[in-house]
Regions:
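Membrane-embedded beta-barrel scaffold of Gram-negative outer-membrane proteins
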Residues: 96-104, 128-204, 292
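Gram-negative outer-membrane beta-barrel transporters
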Residues: 53, 154-156, 175-256, 285-288, ...
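Membrane-embedded beta-strand positions of outer-membrane beta-barrel proteins
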Residues: 47, 59, 91, 105, ...
C-alpha cells in the first residue's frame, strides 16, 4: 500500500516506531510559496603601471547594479526589495625582490549580496559590505616548476549573516552582525619537485570575531591543512596520497544554554585528519585502471558540528577507463 508523508511548518516527524507503512494520501492543495527576482549588471576594468623595472602598481574596479525582489506566502512573510549601485575599487602594488621572489600588497572593498539569508521576518539581509587588506610574498623555484606563496590579510565586514535556530517555531533564520573582523594567514606550495614527483600543499588560518572579541562562527575550523602528492613509479604506474587536517569546531552558543557536559560534547567536533591513497596503472595507450582508497583509517567525523551526519567512511573504488 502506498504511504505518504506530509511536510508542514511544524516540522514534526511521525513516530516511526508506530508507523505500519500505511498512511492515507493527504489532501494538500497547491500553494505558491513565493518568488524571487534578481538582476545583476556589472562593468569592470583594470590597468597596470610599471614604474620601475621592479615596482608595479595595479588599479581597477567594478561597477555593480544589483536589484533583488523577494516575496513569500509562507508564514505571512512580507515583500522585500533591494536596490544597490556600488563601485568596488581594487588597488595593489608589487615589488620584485629578485628574479624568483615578489612582494605585494592590495586593498579592495567588499559588496556581497546574500539573498538566501532571511531574517526572522523572512526578508533577505542587507548585502555584506567591508574592506580587505592583504600583504604577501610569491616565489618560484626549480626553474619555474615549483611555486610558493605566503599571505596575511585583514577583512572587516558589516551585515554578516549569523545563523539563529528558533526551536520554538522549528525554523532557522539569520541576523546581521556588524563590525566583524577576520584575521588570517595563507601558505601554499605547488608544482613538481622532479619530472616524476608532483606536490601541492596548503595551510590556512583565520578567525572571525565581532567587536567584543568573540568568535562569530566557531563551527568553522580556524586551521586547515591539505597535502597532495603523486609519484610516477614507472611510465605506467602512478601512486598518490592525500592528507586533510582541520582543527576542532563547535556549535556551542547561547541558544543551547544551559548546556550539560554531554550536550557540549555532542556539539563539538575535535580536530581530525583523513588519509586517501590512489594507484593508477596504464594498460597500453588507451586503457587505465585505478584504485582509490578513501579515509584509509576509517576516521569518524562530522563536517559540521551541529549536523549529526558523518563524513565518508573507509571506501575502496576500482575504475576501468578506456578511450576510443
Amino acid at each position: 500500500t502506498p504511504s505518504y508523508y506530509e511536510e508542514n511548518e511544524d516540522g514534526i516527524v511521525p513516530d516511526l516506531r508506530l508507523f505500519d507503512g500505511n498512511f492515507t494520501k493527504p489532501a494538500i492543495p497547491y500553494i505558491r510559496d513565493g518568488f524571487a527576482h534578481m538582476k545583476n549588471l556589472s562593468v569592470y576594468g583594470s590597468t597596470r603601471f610599471k614604474l620601475t623595472d621592479r615596482l608595479a602598481l595595479i588599479g581597477g574596479g567594478r561597477f555593480v547594479d544589483w536589484q533583488y525582489r523577494y516575496s513569500s506566502n509562507r508564514n505571512n512573510f512580507a515583500d522585500s526589495r533591494h536596490k544597490n549601485k556600488v563601485f568596488i575599487p581594487y588597488l595593489g602594488a608589487s615589488y620584485d625582490l629578485n628574479d624568483n621572489l615578489t612582494a605585494y600588497t592590495s586593498y579592495t572593498t567588499i559588496f556581497r549580496p546574500q539573498p538566501r539569508y532571511l531574517d526572522r521576518n523572512g526578508k533577505p539581509l542587507e548585502p555584506q559590505r567591508g574592506k580587505t587588506y592583504e600583504l604577501g610574498l610569491k616565489a618560484s623555484g626549480f626553474e619555474g616548476r615549483l611555486n610558493a606563496s605566503a599571505a596575511a590579510f585583514i577583512n572587516k565586514r558589516d551585515h554578516l549573516g549569523k545563523e539563529i535556530r528558533d526551536d520554538e517555531h522549528q525554523r532557522i533564520y539569520y541576523e546581521s552582525v556588524n563590525n566583524t573582523t577576520t584575521k588570517g594567514v595563507e601558505l601554499s606550495v605547488g608544482g613538481r619537485l622532479s619530472d616524476k614527483w608532483l606536490i601541492n600543499a596548503s595551510y590556512a588560518y583565520s578567525k572571525l570575531k565581532n567587536d567584543a572579541g568573540n568568535l562569530v562562527n566557531p563551527s568553522y575550523p580556524a586551521h586547515l591543512f591539505k597535502l597532495f602528492t603523486a609519484y610516477d613509479v614507472t611510465d605506467r604506474l602512478n601512486l598518490g596520497a592525500n592528507v586533510n587536517w582541520q582543527s576542532g569546531t563547535n556549535a556551542v552558543s547561547d541558544e543551547y544554554q544551559p548546556l550539560t557536559a554531554a550536550g557540549k560534547e555532542a556539539l563539538t567536533q575535535r580536530s581530525y585528519a583523513t588519509l586517501d591513497l590512489t594507484a593508477h596503472y596504464k594498460i597500453g595507450k588507451s586503457t587505465r585502471i585505478g584504485l582509490d582508497f578513501e579515509n584509509v583509517f576509517n576516521k569518524r567525523y562530522r563536517p559540521m558540528p551541529d549536523i549529526h551526519v558523518y563524513g565518508t567512511p573507509r571506501s575502496l573504488t576500482a575504475t576501468l577507463k578506456h578511450t576510443f
